[in-house]
Curated annotation (Swiss-Prot):
The keyword Amino-acid biosynthesis does not apply. It catalyses: diphosphate + H2O = 2 phosphate + H(+). It is an enzyme of class 3 (hydrolase). It comes from Bacillus sp. (strain PS3). This is Inorganic pyrophosphatase.
Amino acid sequence: MAFENKIVEAFIEIPTGSQNKYEFDKERGIFKLDRVLYSPMFYPAEYGYLQNTLALDGDPLDILVITTNPPFPGCVIDTRVIGYLNMVDSGEEDAKLIGVPVEDPRFDEVRSIEDLPQHKLKEIAHFFERYKDLQGKRTEIGTWEGPEAAAKLIDECIARYNEQK
């Protein structure tokens, strides 16, 4: 039986091209400007999280969605998860899922990070390696993992969330 990619609902906080780091305040039901990036860089993809998950850093599991056109903050995108980037942010594991919109035919054949242009993966890794430099914070970029490992990571983060409830 062939592997089926996980389909998730990605809750988008930050659109592609933004230098603003927005965070959704769940208690108040509003978006808040967390900070403007210190570096002259911009988010290389839609950035958000998966609701009802808990990653090792204590936050919901992060996700980047590669899109044709940027959505608005608060948009939920049905996303095919194609892998993730292992990284460490300020000493904590901070995996970044990578996915593509289910409802965009331009991505119908994209099932793995290997199906993306290598340059796009380099842009994403470079962004996360450097975006906190001017804040004096350190990030370390690890390996790229495929869709099977991403599915396992999602399941672990859902289980961790359910244990914490």
